[in-house]
Regions:
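Conserved aromatic anchor
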Residues: 1-11
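Hydrophobic/tyrosine-rich beta-strand signature of extracellular beta-sandwich/beta-rich modules
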Residues: 48-52
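A glycine-rich, often tryptophan-bearing local segment used as a flexible ligand/cofactor-contacting loop or short
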Residues: 206-313, 328, 370
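Extracellular fibronectin type III
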Residues: 44, 55-77
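Acidic carboxylate-rich catalytic motifs and surrounding loops in phosphoryl-/glycosyl-chemistry enzymes
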Residues: 179-188, 246-249, 279-286, 332-335, ...
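Recognizes extended acidic, P/S/T-rich segments that occur
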Residues: 9-45
């Protein structure tokens, strides 16, 4: 849908350009369309991705997020993939409590590195001098704000807004078709989860985050907004199958350092999705193992991106979450400490929640293996 710019009334969209990417190829040069809908035919068995720009006499807008779809050969069903990872932010920061507020402050990358837009080429390393009173003495001793330089030559991956394609590739591999949408369309009601037997909510590193210095505008990027909670609750009540993954699925509702927890949010997590928060910063090594449970037999080990790199955003603070119902179980644990990394629930509906983002798994083989296990659980109640 077009969005009006209140600061510039002439910036209205007149036409749109739809760009298409087939499989692992690049985007084409786009198709100019006159209205905000476009119909095309998809090849079978391959992920097709789309992005849209708006155009008028003044030029072309920035592109939209990238949404994808895929039609499987003899599909077992269709999965709705919801892209709920919109966050862009600076790292976590702190200012010491008074009277030390004039003495200590800085960024805490290990707590939350933040999320760059697409990629970051300016980051050089973690901050290491937090004392405000330390002056610049030399370029090698630059005082307050001084940082390590071990990432000076490296590109750091951020939010690329294209994760439905990664999830979709694993869904196709498991024999299911998929479509995708933004979380806003679900919240507004223009897309109904109830039309699909399976849903996959991508939360990435979504969590409530301040804008700028904070205190002027409300926090943004909440994992489960009130409209999303309502949509998910209705979907589960009708017997749906929901997969959710993200770094802060528990912390954002129980222990976000920027806001007080809301009991209604926690009730939604425990009574609808059937998990509860245990701890943030649950693991440092980025390794997960499947364990024996009613979910099914163990199907191997997994690893996710736990260090800064150019290929995928970093997961520095995964969540440990635990079952909140007798009918729920832990089916994955962090290898280094056995904290619960994934919870599955089987009742009148089924849920599967991970405390780390699915798309950050390092290899396609790992993603394919885990997605097949989850969809098999949804279909049969356990892995076969």
């Amino acid at each position: 849908q077009p969005v009006a710019d209140p600061l510039e009334p002439t910036a209205n969209a007149e036409k749109y350009i739809v760009y298409t990417c087939i499989g692992d190829g690049d985007f084409d040069n786009g198709v100019l369309v006159d209205k905000n809908s476009y119909r095309t035919t998809l090849p079978t068995g391959v992920v097709c991705s789309f992005k849209v720009t708006a155009v008028n006499k003044g030029g072309e807008s920035f592109p939209s997020e990238i949404l994808s779809a895929g039609h499987a050969f003899q599909p077992k069903g269709t999965v709705l993939v919801i892209n709920g990872f919109d966050r862009i932010s600076a790292p976590a920061d702190f200012v010491a409590s008074a009277p030390a507020d004039t003495l200590l402050a800085g960024f805490l990358d290990d707590v939350d590195h933040g999320v760059p837009y697409i990629k970051d080429i300016s980051y050089i390393g973690k901050m290491k001098e937090f004392r405000r009173t330390i002056p610049w003495m030399d370029d090698d001793a630059s005082g307050f704000g001084d940082s390590y330089g071990n990432y000076e030559t490296q590109v750091i991956a951020g939010n690329t807004f294209d994760y439905p394609a990664i999830h979709g590739a694993a869904i196709l591999q498991a024999g299911y078709s998929f479509v995708s949408c933004s979380d806003e369309t679900v919240e507004e009601g223009s897309v109904s989860m109830n039309d699909y037997a399976y849903a996959d909510l991508i939360l990435g590193k979504e969590c409530q985050t301040k804008m700028g210095r904070g205190g002027v505008k409300p926090l943004k990027f909440k994992t489960f907004s009130q409209p999303m909670q309502q949509a998910i609750t209705a979907y589960c009540q009708q017997g749906g199958n929901l997969f959710v993954s993200g770094s802060y699925v528990g912390t954002d509702l129980w222990n976000n350092r920027l806001t007080q927890p809301n009991k209604a949010d926690q009730k939604f997590a425990t009574e609808v999705l059937k998990y509860q928060w245990r701890v943030n910063l649950a693991a440092a090594e980025g390794r997960v193992k499947s364990v024996a449970s009613p979910f099914g037999k163990p199907n191997g080990d997994y690893s996710f991106h736990n260090e800064l790199n150019a290929d995928c955003y970093v997961v520095e603070a995964p969540d440990a979450i635990e079952p909140a119902s007798p009918d729920a179980c832990t089916f994955m644990r962090y290898s280094e400490n056995n904290l619960s990394a994934g919870v599955a629930y089987r009742g009148t509906y089924k849920t599967c929640v991970l405390g780390f983002p699915f798309e950050t798994l390092r290899t396609a083989e790992e993603r394919n293996r885990l997605m097949e296990a989850i969809l098999t659980f949804f279909d049969y109640g356990e892995q076969k």
